[in-house]
């Protein structure tokens, strides 16, 4: 049960850190609204369940697309105008914080409206009762793992087997040179925000099967998302995935171990664990684990 929960949580953190890294690589903006976009996806799944009786697993493609559209709106209406005006990274970062607060306020109002209309709980909810089991193993383990594998396969195919993917990679590695070569860098940025927010929506739909969701959940989980991305190397897609699993598993296992020693009150401080892992990794490998391992391997092979 513990290992099952750790794997599920790691799958979701890996999906979220992957999305965060994609937008950082293409626009150099750390998106502080990423966690709240995921929770918005959770609430979209809840709306589809309450009003249209669509099971959350069936709702995945719908939420995926809707959250992707939210990402396009965030970039097109807020970030692109600022980038065109030559805004610094700090200003863009503050803009994502503002987006986070706007989304958070909207989610709070949305949860009030859902409760008033349906008389069902929306301020706090969980999807565990809608899950299935196979041989005593929760369905969320299979679904989250299958989702992660599917995303990795599709992303690999997109980046390495399509013309648009090659253009996207070129824009990620050197936007100025890509633009000189005639690549529409703006289009790749819009797509990256769509993809990033879609991944957040996917993770957000699955998250209520793992834990209770409240409007502020995104503000808590963003700590783990950023820790995973930075630990792996903020500009590395492979690092984001590796960091997601490292942070997810260590946070789950360490929280469980500490709760056995100090009691359940320690759960209030669970986010100290990913932050501690982040500090340790940055002290040993400032550029992230993936780049750090490459340097160590190169050093010992001399």
Predicted regions mapped to residue ranges:
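Inter-helical junctions in multi-pass inner-membrane proteins, predominant
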Residues: 1-12, 155-163, 192-232, 252-269
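Transmembrane helix-bundle core of multi-pass membrane transporters
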Residues: 90-161, 260-271, 296-302
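Short loop segments and helix-boundary regions at transmembrane helix junctions
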Residues: 26-30, 69-117, 161-163, 219-234, ...
